[in-house]
A protein has these predicted regions:
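All-alpha helical catalytic cores of prenyl diphosphate-utilizing isoprenoid enzymes
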Residues: 85-150, 156-172, 178-256
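Acidic, metal/ion-handling microdomains and their immediate structural contexts
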Residues: 1-96, 129-180, 256
Length: 256
């Protein structure tokens, strides 16, 4: 298999060779855009109201039925997934795993916002789609949950312009060491939550048996550190390479 750096260079070449390719994107009228935004705002508000007291209703039969209906409607409306083309049995598995992920997320952190859950859930869906493409049975375990949940915790912290660079640097240094297997307790909720998620991955994929899993996670972290530097001082070539590096490492981890 090609090295990761070779794959990054190959993707860069492919991107440059596609510059003259015309995308067949249908224009969306302003009125339709406005209507779509309105629907998105209403959908988000509706879900937030529904999830507000979710922790107290997870075992309630009526709540579970309503959750089934909502998740199924969400899957069917998601244009990227193209859910309707999946076989009925696969649709059922998709639905079951999505519901379980939402329950797990709410149990893990009752303070999670809907945006955070959706951000992590998209990664779960990507993993499930990869399994479909590889014609494998869909599976869900705590490492998939934990890896997906790392995104809202780490990305949102590092992308927050209100947090100074020094705090981000300290966190990145700690996370890099944690992904290498170092245990250095920190007295802050963010660190404890991320540490718990990494521990879940370690429980499912022991380091000695699955070194490639942690190599991929470290690649993502390296890309994240580089992306913090992604500002006006970087040229287009550097920005493109960082984007390919980070995105490629994420898909590689999904595959593992």
């Amino acid at each position: 298999m090609s090295s990761f750096e070779e794959l990054v260079r190959e993707c860069d070449r492919l991107w440059l060779n596609c510059r003259c390719t015309r995308l067949r994107l249908t224009p969306v009228k302003k009125q339709v855009q406005k209507e779509n935004r309105r629907k998105a705002v209403e959908l988000k508000a509706d879900w937030e109201t529904f999830l507000q007291h979710a922790a107290d209703n997870l075992e309630d039969a009526g709540w579970k039925t309503e959750m089934d209906r909502r998740v199924l409607a969400l899957l069917r409306s998601e244009s990227v997934l193209n859910f309707a083309v999946l076989k009925p049995a696969v649709q059922e598995e998709f639905l079951s795993i999505t519901k379980q992920f939402v329950r797990d997320a709410m149990c893990f952190d009752t303070a999670l916002e809907l945006d955070d859950i959706m951000q992590a859930m998209r990664n779960v869906w990507i993993i499930l789609l990869l399994e479909c493409m590889l014609e494998r049975k869909l599976c869900y375990h705590k490492a998939i949950f934990a890896y997906s949940m790392l995104y809202p915790y780490t990305d949102n912290f590092l992308d927050d312009p209100a947090i100074d660079r020094q705090r981000k640097k300290v966190f990145n240094s700690w996370l890099s060491e944690r992904l290498k297997g170092e245990q250095r307790p920190m007295d802050a909720d963010l660190y404890r939550q991320v540490d718990a998620l990494v521990s879940m991955i370690e429980d499912t994929f022991p380091r000695q048996q699955f070194p490639d899993v942690y190599d991929a996670l470290l690649r993502i972290q390296e890309g994240q550190i580089l992306s913090v530097q992604q500002d006006s001082r970087l040229c287009e070539e550097e920005i493109r390479r960082i984007s390919i590096y980070k995105g490629g490492a994420s898909v590689l981890a999904d595959g593992y």
